[in-house]
Amino acid sequence: MTSLDSAPPRLAPARPGGGRGGRLGERLLHAYTWLILLWLVLPIIVMIVFGFNDRVGKRNNTWNGFTLRWWGELFAIPDLTTALVNSLTIALLSTAVATTLGTLMGLALGRHTFRGRGGVELLMFANIAAPEVVLGASLLSLFITMGVPRGYLTILIAHIMFNISYVAVVVRARLAGFDSSVEEAARDLGAGPFTTFRLVTLPLILPGVLSGALLAFAMSIDEYVITTFNAGSTLTFPLWVFGATRVGVPPQVNVMATIIFVVGVLLALGNALLLRRRQI
Amino acid sequence: MTATGHTATGHTATGHTATGHTATGDAATGAPPAIELAGVAKDYHSRGRAVPAVSRIDLAIGPGEFFSLLGPSGCGKSTTLRMIAGFEEPTRGRILLQGRDVTAVPPNRRDVNLVFQSYALFPHLDVAGNVAFGLRRRGVKGRELRERVGTMLDLVELSELAERRPRELSGGQQQRVALARALVNRPAALLLDEPLGALDLKLRQTMQIQLKAIQREVGITFIYVTHDQGEALTMSDRIAVMNRGRVEQLASPREIYERPRTRFVAGFIGTSNLLRRTVRAVDAAGPGGRAMVVLDAGADERLSAPLHPQMGPLRTGDQVELTVRPEKIEMSATRPDGPCCALRGRIVEVVYLGTYTTYTVATHGGTEITVFWQNSTDSTNVAERGEEIWLSWLPEHSYVLPESADEEPSTPRSGGPDPGGPPEGDAPRRNGEPAAGAAAQTPTATAAHPVSP
Ligand SMILES: Nc1ncnc2c1ncn2[C@@H]1O[C@H](COP(=O)(O)OP(=O)(O)O)[C@@H](O)[C@H]1O
Ligand SMILES: [Mg+2]
């Protein structure tokens, strides 16, 4: 490593093997880094590759030749398609609602001092830190007590619930160092409170809001634990896939997951670019 | 302002107490002042305690006037400005814009614009977008919008940079965008909070001249907040010198400089010599019908000065302070004749400064007096260190101020709220004089350091 290579020369005679040892250490580090990266990426690669596997039988876990068949028959399994549509609409809706509410909550926490602010903050972090099993189970008992039938709506409510905190945390972080005198300048120049928010505050916190929305979408689309408690007979993509593991996951799942993954990566990259371009 | 009725020689006019207020609204035409503050006070609340930031301010600022609020950091200048703009609600008192009470009107519906100390430009809009912001809120669009923005950018010489974002501009350019963004709305008054504070000296001096020129051109009332006395003296028609949330003196720059009303003003504006003496006699009908105060002095020495016009009556034996500017003092080897003030002294320091030389002279009382001697003809010093000389000045070039009774030796210069709580409005006052505690502020860095006898 560089720190060893650039060690003071007076140490060199005492440790003749120092230079070579350094190179060895460096190689080990490289190897270790690649190993970790591989470990992280390998499942994804396998998932993508097996979307192109010309499967025989029920199990899709031995390579049998390349095909684009599953991409063509993407929506051939009606239940899976329904589950995917459920997942996507729930993710979009919960993201929209949670981003709106979470942004307002983040603004309140980051900009104002009010009675009970500490309590709200604690609640927000508790929501993030609490085990999903606990959240899911307690929500379920709440719904049962209130007599709300489990299904699409309860899944949506649950997703909004856990997403609000994530958005609020991200927006709040974005507000650190926010110069509120630009809002005063807008008021001074004749903008009312709402116009000021629309023309000044929102554009300035937009990168934070988008990051929060992205995070919320990603959290929602693959949520399993809380969803399974509150789904009733409704199925989402993760629930359907988990159910299918017992009988063999069809390659369509790989294709759908590949598409979700690629879209997710593109969105994240776009957001990062946006953040870099508008360093404010 | 030349209306104060006295000339450059410092010849004193009688009745000048009223002339300091000539620019406040025009009684003859009946036009209301552009801005009026009536008994305005502001307390901030921190940890359940009320902290007074502005104690009580009464002001009337005339249309088209260049008015400065001058004072040390923390004296309440920004708070006053923010109350006028509508960002702070006064705890007491009323604010009137062109005769209309706007105390409860939100900032977006007040016809004033503020140039923020930090500029507060919109980082996501370009220069033109920043300048157009206020006009767009008023529904100005299309050609008129483009023309007015273009004219304003020409005025502040930023036309070339119209498409730049604020972060791509230098400090001076950002400052001019902030100015243009406010001015383009043609407000009834423009409020400027230390607008040149972040610029370097050279740019600041250029901008002072430009600002004054722009103000003359657009004819809008300017209220200019600064802690820089040079800036205030250069640009203003009138100055309100603030200290601890009060106005200590409100007058023209010349009046403020030549007749500081309080010890604080004398110390804060320029360099002042302060001599602490006892009153020996009061001549109620001195030259020009003015009360002259004769002060204790040594043998063949003579100290007399007019009473400050706004100061109450004095009696023999009262402790007072005489103030005289360093450039009004003459030095000579022998005792000067005539009715001037004369003091003996020994030169302890000579500092050559190009256009003038500074002499520090120790009087027999022990007070050190600073003298500015213009290097107009002679290139040699008129006197050397250690020499015994006579100091003299005309009595009307000096003033007698009340001696600050309860002087605190180490008042923080910030003038922030002091932990014990500053004296509130019920402290004893004399003839409109601020409470003694307020007048007792330690002079700032610009003041000479008089040594008490
Ligand atoms: N928002 C605030 N809350 C509490 N105290 C404040 C606030 N703003 C200003 N102050 C206090 O009020 C006093 C006057 O402040 P300010 O008007 O900013 O002074 P200046 O502009 O003359 O430096 C200061 O002592 C300051 O600490
Ligand atoms: Mg200030």
Model-derived segments and spans:
Chain B
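Conserved coupling/switch loops of ABC nucleotide-binding domains, chiefly the family-specific signature
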Residues: 91-94, 144, 244, 276
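Helix-to-loop junction immediately C-terminal to a conserved catalytic motif
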Residues: 85
